[in-house]
C-alpha cells in the first residue's frame, strides 16, 4: 500500500536526520516520566510508575502536545495511547459531544478524575448507533488542555478503589500548580483538502488561543489559572446526493426500478411529487447537499483555576475548578423541496357564483383564500389573516410580514409559491405545481437543518488535607453540572405548516442537564509490621447524588410530528430524576518481602434505586530480578445505569424515517415487554511483564480479559412500518408510541422505537505493549523512542431474548440481529501500534509518530439483502512536527498530521441500476448506483440521499491531512 510505504520512509528519514545533526538539549525522557510519582492505582505514598504493580502510563505536556496537532485532550490521548480510542465524528447531537473509551469498551466504563477526584458526566447522551452508543461520560474537551501538568492513565479495572464505573480503567488529569510564570500560546490549522476529500464548500480550519499563569497565594500558596478559546469550522466528506444528480429525480423512500434508459440511468416509479432538478441545483454544496458526515462547527471558551495553601506541614486547603461554554452546530441530512409543502385548495375558476376564485373555503382547513381580484390570505393558528392591499399580497409564515407574489389576479393550479418571499416558483415548464392544486412551498431549493447546542459546564472542588494521629486525611466536596440547550435551525414543522400555513424556521428544542454532587473523605496510615515495607491501610467513604433532567422545548417544535430533523422535547418527556449512592472502601498495600508487592481492596456501595453491591480487587507484583518483574490483577466491577440511560426520550427524524427513543423505565417500554434496567457486572483479569534489560530501556507487556454481564446497549429499531428485512411489529409499536404521547411523521416510510436494555454480555481480551528507550547521539541530539501497541478483541456472548409480547406480534423479531452483533465486535480495529521518535538538539526539536492501524470490518446498511461490505485495509498514518526555540521564551512549531493525506477506503460499490431487473426494490439500507454522474465507488446507503464515502466511526480522521502552526511564549 503506497501510503504505508511512504509513511515508513518518512520515519526512517527523520531518524537519519537525528543522527547527522550537531550537542543535545536535555528534556524529560520517557524514562524520566516513568519515575514520576503517581497518585493513581495505588494508595502508597511515593510510588512511581516504573515500580507500580498496576499498568499505568504517565503523559506529560510534551507527550500530549508534540506531534498531535491538537489542543483537545481527548484527541491528544487518542493520538498517544493505543488502547484509548477517540471518536472522530458522529451524527446528530452525538457530533456535538464526541466520546472516548479504553480497550474498546463503552465510554461509560472509564472513570475520569481531576486531581484524583471524580469528574461529572456530560448531559448529552449518544443514542445513535456505532462507537460510543449509549454513552454520557465526562467530556474531556471542556478541560483546558493548557491547564494540564500531566495525565495518568490506569489500564486496569479499578472499581474497588475509585468507584463502580471504573471497569476499563481510569484517566486522572493532574492540573498545573505553579506559583509563578506562565505561557501564552496560539495554534492555527487547516485540512489539506479544506474540508475532506469530497471537495469542498466547508473548510475545516481550527484556531486556538490559551493563556495561563501561576501566582503566589500569600507566602505559602499558589493560584494557577488558565483560559482557552477554541474554534473549529465545518468539514464535509459525504458523497453526492443521487436525488440531485439523477435525471430520474429519485423520490424519498422505497423506490421501484421500472426500467433503464439508454444512458444507464434508472427510471424509478414516483411515490410522491417529483422535484425539477433546476430548483435544487443551486443549493449550497451541490451536489453534495448532505453535510451530516463531517466535523461540526463550534466555539469553545473554557477556564480553569487550581489553588492551594499550606498553613503548616500538617494542614492545607485546596480548591480547583473548570468552567466552559460551547456553541456548536452540526449539519443534518438534506431535505427535498417537497418535504414541507401545503396545498392551498382545489382549483375553481372565477364565476358569478364563485367571485373569490378557487376554494372560497367555508372550512379553515382549506388554508388559503384567494380572490379573482388579487388578495389572498394565509391561515394562522388564530384563524385567517385578512390582507388588504395589493393583488397577490400574503403573509410570510415564518415572520408574519406582508409579502407579494408580484402577480395581479388570481392564483392558478399551475402555480407554486415560495412561502418565504411570496414569489412564484419557476420550473422548466413554467410555474407547475407539485400536485394538482396550488401549493405553498417553504423551501423551494430544499433545506439542510442544523442541530445547535449551547452548552454551559462547570465543576468545582474544595477540600482540606491534614494529619491526625498518624493518619493522612483528605476531605473533599465537589459539584459539577452540564446544561445543554438544544435548537434546530433552518427547519420547519411540516404538519404545523399544513394545518396553519405557518411555521417557525428555527426552534428551541428544550434542554438536557446532568449534575453530580460528591463528598469524600480518605485516610491513609502506614503501619510497621515487620515486613519489607510498612502496611499501608487506606479507608474512605463517599456520598454522591446524581441528577438528570430534560426540559420542555417550544411547543411548536413538538407539535404533532414535530420539526424536521429533531422535534424537540415535549412536556410528556420532560422531568428531573435523581438518585443517591453511598460507598465505603478499604485498601491494604504491603511488601511482605522485598521482591513482592500486594494490594488488596474492597468496596461496598448502596444505591437508592439498585440496592447494595460488593466488589474487590487483588493486585500483585513480583520482581524476579532487578531487571524483570511480573504483575497481575483480579478484580470485579459494577456499573449502575446512568440516569440518562434510564430516562432519556426523544424522536429522531430523518427525511424518510422517524424513530422514538423510549425511556427504559417507562410504561411505554414496559408495554413492549421491557423491564427496568439492571446494573452491569464485570470480572477482569490481567497478567503482565515489566522488563529493564538495559539501563535506559524499559518494556511492559500486559494481557487482559474483561467479561461484562448485563451490558447496557441500545436496541435495534422495532418498526411499526418499514420495508422487507426490517423488524416490523405494528400491534406493539403503535400502542407504545401512543402511550409515550408522541405523533410520528405519517410520510415516513419507516417508523419505530428503540430503548436501552441489558441486551448482551461481552468478553474483551487483548494485550498492551510499551517500550521506551532514550538514545543520546552526543553532538547529533537526543532521541526518545517510544513504541506502544494494543491488540484488542471483543466477543458478544449472551443475547437478551425478545420478550414474549413482541414475539407474539412478530415471531421473527429480535433486538439484536447479526449486523448489530458484528458492529459490537468490529467497531474498532483489533490492532494499533504507535512508534514515536522525539528529537532535541539545542534550540531545535522534531517529533515523528507513525501510527499503524489494523484492518477494520464494517457494513454500511442494516441487515438486509443489500448489505454493502466496507472492509477498511490496514493503514499507516504519519505525523510530523518541527520546533525551534527562537529565544529562551519563544518557541515556534510547524507540523502536519497525516502527512500523506490518507483517507479511509471508499465504501464498496453497490451494483449498478442497469444490472437490476424491473421491479427490483431499492431498500433504504443499501441501493444501486443511479447513473453516470455518481463518482466511482460512491454508494448511496439510505433513502435520505446520504452517501457515506467512509464508514461512520472511522478510527482516524476521515478529513485527511491536517497542517498546523503553533507559537508559544513562556514567561
Model-derived segments and their meaning:
Residues 40, 119, 133-185, 236:
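A beta-strand signature from Gram-negative outer-membrane beta-barrel systems
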Residues 180, 197-445, 449-463, 467, ...:
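Transmembrane beta-barrel wall of Gram-negative outer-membrane proteins
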Residues 37-70, 123-133, 185:
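N-terminal periplasmic "start-of-domain" segments of outer-membrane beta-barrel proteins
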Amino acid at each position: 500500500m503506497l501510503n504505508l510505504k511512504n509513511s515508513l520512509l518518512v520515519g526512517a528519514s527523520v531518524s537519519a536526520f537525528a543522527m547527522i545533526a550537531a550537542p543535545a538539549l536535555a528534556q524529560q525522557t520517557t524514562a524520566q516520566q516513568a519515575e514520576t510519582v503517581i497518585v493513581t492505582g495505588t494508595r502508597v505514598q511515593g510510588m512511581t510508575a516504573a515500580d507500580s504493580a498496576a499498568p499505568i502510563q504517565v503523559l506529560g505536556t510534551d507527550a500530549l502536545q508534540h506531534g498531535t496537532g491538537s489542543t483537545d485532550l481527548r484527541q491528544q490521548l487518542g493520538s498517544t495511547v493505543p488502547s484509548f480510542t477517540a471518536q472522530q465524528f458522529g451524527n446528530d447531537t452525538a457530533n456535538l459531544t464526541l466520546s472516548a473509551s479504553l480497550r474498546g469498551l463503552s465510554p461509560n466504563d472509564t472513570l475520569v478524575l481531576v486531581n484524583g477526584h471524580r469528574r461529572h458526566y456530560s448531559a448529552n447522551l449518544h443514542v445513535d448507533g456505532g462507537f460510543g452508543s449509549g454513552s454520557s461520560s465526562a467530556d474531556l474537551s471542556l478541560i483546558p488542555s493548557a491547564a494540564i501538568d500531566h495525565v495518568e492513565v490506569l489500564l486496569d479495572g479499578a472499581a474497588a478503589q475509585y468507584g463502580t464505573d471504573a471497569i476499563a480503567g481510569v484517566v486522572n488529569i493532574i492540573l498545573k500548580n505553579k506559583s509563578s510564570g506562565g505561557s501564552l500560546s496560539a495554534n492555527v490549522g487547516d485540512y489539506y483538502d479544506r474540508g475532506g476529500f469530497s471537495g469542498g464548500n466547508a473548510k475545516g480550519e481550527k484556531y486556538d488561543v490559551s493563556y495561563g499563569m501561576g501566582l503566589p497565594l500569600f507566602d505559602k500558596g499558589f493560584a494557577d489559572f488558565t483560559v482557552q478559546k477554541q474554534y473549529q469550522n465545518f468539514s464535509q466528506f459525504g458523497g453526492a446526493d443521487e436525488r440531485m444528480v439523477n435525471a430520474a429525480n429519485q423520490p424519498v423512500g422505497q423506490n421501484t426500478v421500472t426500467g433503464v434508459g439508454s444512458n444507464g440511468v434508472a427510471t424509478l416509479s414516483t411515490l410522491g411529487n417529483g422535484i425539477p432538478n433546476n430548483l435544487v441545483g443551486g443549493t449550497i454544496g451541490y451536489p453534495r447537499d448532505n453535510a451530516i458526515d463531517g466535523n461540526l462547527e463550534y466555539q469553545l471558551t473554557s477556564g480553569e483555576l487550581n489553588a492551594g495553601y499550606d498553613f503548616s506541614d500538617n494542614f492545607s486547603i485546596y480548591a480547583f475548578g473548570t468552567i466552559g461554554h460551547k456553541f456548536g452546530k452540526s449539519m443534518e441530512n438534506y431535505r427535498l423541496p417537497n418535504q414541507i409543502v401545503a396545498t392551498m385548495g382545489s382549483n375553481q375558476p372565477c364565476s358569478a357564483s364563485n367571485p373569490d376564485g378557487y376554494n372560497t373555503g367555508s372550512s379553515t382547513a382549506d388554508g388559503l383564500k384567494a380572490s379573482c381580484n388579487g388578495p389572498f390570505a394565509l391561515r394562522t393558528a388564530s384563524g385567517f389573516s385578512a390582507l388588504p392591499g395589493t393583488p397577490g399580497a400574503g403573509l410570510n409564515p415564518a415572520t408574519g410580514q406582508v409579502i407579494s407574489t408580484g402577480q395581479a389576479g388570481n392564483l392558478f393550479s399551475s402555480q407554486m409559491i415560495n412561502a418565504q418571499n411570496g414569489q412564484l416558483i419557476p420550473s422548466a415548464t413554467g410555474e407547475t405545481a407539485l400536485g394538482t392544486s396550488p401549493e405553498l412551498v417553504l423551501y423551494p431549493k430544499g433545506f439542510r437543518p442544523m442541530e445547535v447546542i449551547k452548552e454551559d459546564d462547570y465543576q468545582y472542588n474544595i477540600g482540606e488535607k491534614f494529619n491526625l494521629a498518624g493518619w493522612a486525611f483528605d476531605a473533599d466536596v465537589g459539584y459539577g453540572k452540564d446544561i445543554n440547550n438544544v435548537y434546530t435551525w433552518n427547519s420547519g414543522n411540516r404538519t404545523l405548516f399544513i394545518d396553519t400555513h405557518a411555521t417557525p424556521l428555527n426552534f428551541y428544542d428544550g434542554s438536557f442537564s446532568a449534575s453530580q454532587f460528591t463528598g469524600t473523605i480518605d485516610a491513609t496510615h502506614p503501619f510497621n509490621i515487620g515486613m519489607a515495607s510498612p502496611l499501608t491501610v487506606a479507608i474512605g467513604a463517599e456520598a454522591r447524588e446524581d441528577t438528570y433532567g430534560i426540559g420542555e422545548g417550544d411547543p411548536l417544535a413538538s407539535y404533532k410530528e414535530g420539526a424536521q430533523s429533531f422535534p424537540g422535547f415535549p412536556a410528556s418527556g420532560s422531568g428531573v430524576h435523581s438518585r443517591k449512592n453511598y460507598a465505603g472502601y478499604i485498601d491494604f498495600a504491603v511488601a511482605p518481602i522485598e521482591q513482592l508487592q500486594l494490594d488488596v481492596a474492597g468496596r461496598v456501595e448502596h444505591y437508592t434505586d439498585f440496592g447494595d453491591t460488593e466488589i474487590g480487587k487483588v493486585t500483585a507484583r513480583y520482581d524476579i530480578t532487578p531487571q524483570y518483574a511480573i504483575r497481575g490483577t483480579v478484580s470485579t466491577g459494577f456499573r449502575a445505569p446512568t440516569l440518562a440511560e434510564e430516562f432519556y426520550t426523544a424522536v429522531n427524524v430523518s427525511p424518510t424515517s422517524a424513530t422514538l427513543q423510549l425511556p427504559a423505565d417507562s410504561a411505554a417500554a414496559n408495554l413492549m415487554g421491557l423491564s427496568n434496567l439492571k446494573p452491569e457486572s464485570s470480572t477482569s483479569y490481567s497478567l503482565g511483564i515489566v522488563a529493564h534489560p538495559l539501563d535506559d530501556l524499559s518494556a511492559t507487556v500486559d494481557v487482559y480479559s474483561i467479561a461484562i454481564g448485563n451490558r447496557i446497549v441500545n436496541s435495534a429499531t422495532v418498526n411499526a412500518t418499514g420495508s422487507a428485512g426490517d423488524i416490523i411489529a405494528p400491534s406493539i409499536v403503535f400502542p407504545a408510541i401512543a402511550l409515550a404521547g408522541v405523533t410520528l411523521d405519517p410520510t415516513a416510510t419507516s417508523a419505530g422505537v428503540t430503548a436501552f436494555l441489558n441486551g448482551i454480555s461481552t468478553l474483551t481480551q487483548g494485550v498492551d505493549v510499551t517500550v521506551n528507550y532514550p538514545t543520546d547521539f552526543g553532538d547529533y541530539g537526543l532521541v526518545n523512542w517510544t513504541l506502544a501497541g494494543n491488540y484488542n478483541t471483543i466477543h458478544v456472548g449472551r443475547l437478551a431474548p425478545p420478550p414474549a409480547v413482541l414475539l407474539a406480534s412478530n415471531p421473527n423479531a429480535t433486538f439484536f440481529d447479526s449486523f448489530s452483533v458484528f458492529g459490537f465486535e468490529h467497531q474498532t480495529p483489533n490492532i494499533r501500534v504507535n512508534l514515536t521518535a522525539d528529537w532535541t538538539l539545542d534550540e531545535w526539536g522534531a517529533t515523528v509518530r507513525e501510527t499503524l492501524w489494523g484492518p477494520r470490518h464494517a457494513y454500511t446498511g442494516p441487515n438486509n439483502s443489500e448489505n454493502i461490505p466496507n472492509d477498511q485495509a490496514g493503514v499507516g498514518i504519519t505525523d510530523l512536527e518541527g520546533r525551534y526555540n527562537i529565544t529562551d521564551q519563544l518557541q515556534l512549531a510547524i507540523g502536519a498530521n497525516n502527512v500523506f493525506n490518507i483517507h479511509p477506503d471508499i465504501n464498496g460499490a453497490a451494483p449498478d441500476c442497469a444490472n437490476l431487473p424491473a421491479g427490483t426494490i431499492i431498500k433504504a439500507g443499501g441501493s444501486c448506483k443511479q447513473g453516470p454522474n455518481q463518482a466511482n465507488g460512491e454508494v448511496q446507503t439510505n433513502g435520505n440521499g446520504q452517501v457515506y464515502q467512509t464508514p461512520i466511526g472511522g478510527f482516524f480522521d476521515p478529513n485527511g491531512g491536517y497542517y498546523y502552526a503553533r507559537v508559544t511564549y513562556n514567561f
